[in-house]
């Protein structure tokens, strides 16, 4: 677990009122959700869970029906992931979880940052697979991008 906290003007504790956890169905993202739920419970904070569909893969651009099916498939998967997170939250006594799946022409990183900024989120809790070296360079890192550009504190969970 890594915490990247934004500096405050004084030494007072920053209140966490809104927490965002982006998920992609991986075990890393579900682990991040577990941490986010515990923090939300301890801080009595609102919890937002999102899944971003960045773009349609090249092979799906051949027909409108294929594109529609692609989005339906992703939405079904996301709802399944949200269900898991919702169950974890209920088990911790958090009755309400705000969830959203959306497609965006921007990168996943930009979409997460924009979502967090527009909702004045205080903490982003995001899973990281812990890639290093060439794999990280070639594949990029959503978590790293979020850390670099977030307006708020970020908790990385492995």
Predicted segments with their positions:
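Aromatic/hydrophobic pocket-lining residues that form π-stacking "cages" and hydrophobic walls in ligand
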Residues: 36, 85, 112, 146
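General small-molecule cofactor/ligand-binding pocket signal
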Residues: 50, 98-102, 155
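Structural beta-alpha unit
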Residues: 1-14, 87-124
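A short acidic, glycine-rich active-site loop
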Residues: 67-80
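Gly/Ser-rich helix-loop-strand patches that form or flank binding pockets
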Residues: 1-9, 38, 117-158
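Small/aliphatic-rich secondary-structure junction motif
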Residues: 10-66, 91-92
